[in-house]
Amino acid sequence: MKHHAGLIGLLGLALTIFAYAMFQGGFVSWFLLYATLPFLMFAFIIYFYPVRKMTATRTFTEGELTRGQKLDVEIHIKRSDWWPLYYMKVTDQPPFPEETPKSRVVFIGFRREVVLNYSIDKLPRGAYEFNALELELVDLLGWLRKRWTISTPQQVVVYPRITELSYTPIASNYDQGAARARYQMHKENAVATGVREYQPGDRVSWIHWKSFAKSQTLRTKDFEDRQAQDTLVYLDLTESHSFDDAVDFTISVVQAMASSDTTGAFILPGTRGIYLPAITHQGHVERVKRELATVEPLEEKWMKRLVAEDKRLGTFKGIICITAELDKDRVEAMTHMTPQLREGLYFVVKTEASPKLTTAELAVVDYAQARGWSVVVLPPSQFTEAFLEVLKR
């Protein structure tokens, strides 16, 4: 409708100037008519210009995106003709929270391809969908504006940030002295629970020959690791300002566990959660990372209910619970569900802006310690020293 209004305005202007020249006569009136004709013709051409033939694509920063990283976006706009155009306004709406539309104005002239760039600092974790680009052509004097959109749906996934740290099993004082060696021996007699991609170092006896016969691709049997029942990494999903930092620390611990000489289990609670009885290779880490990229925090009451109903917790002797907020009810529920617990550790992750426990949380520390839980408070700057703090206790 706006396009039609612009066309009607142009026709009205052209008729007015022509009528003025016809009835007024003289050099001035006819000069005015001929002087405005090129601009009017250019505006009419803009109106009828086949904008649908233009194509647009986005390209993003290469490689895996992590929280806090900078994203560079490059927009390529192409057309098939050489018709001269004045300038075009390109608007893109990034899907990230609190991001305003990114607009650029570019002079086109005879160019058939235009490249525009913009950047987004400090990406938030999650999966996001870029939608349509909005383009706007304008004539020389701004009499006519032609807007349209080009559908360019693209998804980007921002993963949690991994910090390298040295993992120390909290259950090293019971049955973990030669965990890796016994894990290898256990595999020889354990029952396979699935198959995975072949990893360097896998034994010939672990190869899944039936799968190899069908696909001609080496795959390895995935075994249930009963030794891993000793230690569990559990992420508390209670909503908090430092929830994303807690997610970052969780994937860092899982990565360190997979790279160490010990094994452990992982539970991400909730209806869309996952349970890994053993974290033994990078494939497990990648699966956890994909899930943590899109995990959302829960209200406190729902998180308490998940803990109180999770019977899997009762099979573990050592538990590393990572939370962004220490709460008495959840500590009580966790204690009740872990009758075999010998070593319990709460990592309470805080932001750099507020690195200390609140008054309410300080009161819970004594309650947790009385029930066998150690409590370590961590801002992101101390992630690398997390398990050093555990050894000091």
Write out the residue ranges for each language-model feature.
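An amphipathic, basic-hydrophobic helix/alpha-beta surface used to engage anionic
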Residues: 38-282, 318-322, 335-336
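Acidic, glycine-rich A-domain
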Residues: 255-393
